[in-house]
């Protein structure tokens, strides 16, 4: 099975995984897909896939591991998620594949599919482990990618893809503060923080 089968499924409307199972059970290709021959497969729109991983692009794509402290995925028209073990509280070990979720964006035109993917990536909130999201956002906005003039050397020859700030985790910090005040009756002030540091 092709790794990017979701892209093919989105533009053809054929569930490739289901078709393979049906064919293995003895159905014909026509019975499994609803298409009598190849000429009946009509391509509709454009799709692209992104693999969100726990790899750190600024550190030679070394996989990160640890506990996912927050996880919110993207949704919306034209967005398909094929997930793994990505959820708040999930533990990513060094012995596990770094893939968290595959995101496929479909739209009538390539530029709209790219815009949908960019929006979806901006909706993700993953905390506790490093991810490649900011790197992929840079890639999707890069003029060479948008002009469809990239080659297999694109990443190696485009250092500005790696220029991004790590996302700040303001939401979790605020929630931790509220929990400390509510549950532990702790109220941090600058004086209290100085005393605590010693």
Describe the function of each predicted region.
Residues 2-190:
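Catalytic cores of soluble metabolic enzymes centered on carboxylation/carboxyl-transfer
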Residues 188-198:
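Single conserved hydrophobic/aromatic residue that forms the stacking wall/gate
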């Amino acid at each position: 099975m092709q790794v990017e089968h979701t892209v093919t499924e989105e533009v053809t409307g054929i569930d490739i995984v289901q078709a393979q199972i049906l064919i293995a059970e003895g159905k014909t290709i026509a019975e499994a897909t609803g298409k009598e021959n190849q000429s009946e497969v009509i391509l509709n729109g454009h799709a692209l896939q992104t693999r969100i991983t726990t790899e750190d692009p600024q550190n030679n794509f070394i996989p990160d591991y640890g506990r996912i402290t927050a996880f919110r995925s993207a949704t919306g028209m034209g967005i398909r998620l094929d997930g793994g073990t990505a959820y708040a509280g999930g533990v990513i070990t060094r012995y596990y594949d770094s893939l968290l979720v595959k995101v496929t964006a479909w739209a009538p035109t390539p530029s709209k599919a790219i815009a949908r993917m960019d929006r979806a990536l901006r909706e993700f909130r993953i905390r506790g482990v490093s991810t490649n999201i900011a790197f992929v956002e840079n890639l999707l906005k890069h003029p060479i990618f948008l002009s469809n003039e990239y080659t297999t050397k694109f990443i190696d020859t485009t250092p500005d893809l790696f220029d991004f700030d790590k996302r700040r985790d303001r939401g979790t910090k605020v929630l931790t503060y509220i929990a400390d005040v509510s549950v532990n009756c702790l109220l941090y002030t600058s004086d209290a923080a100085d005393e605590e540091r010693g």
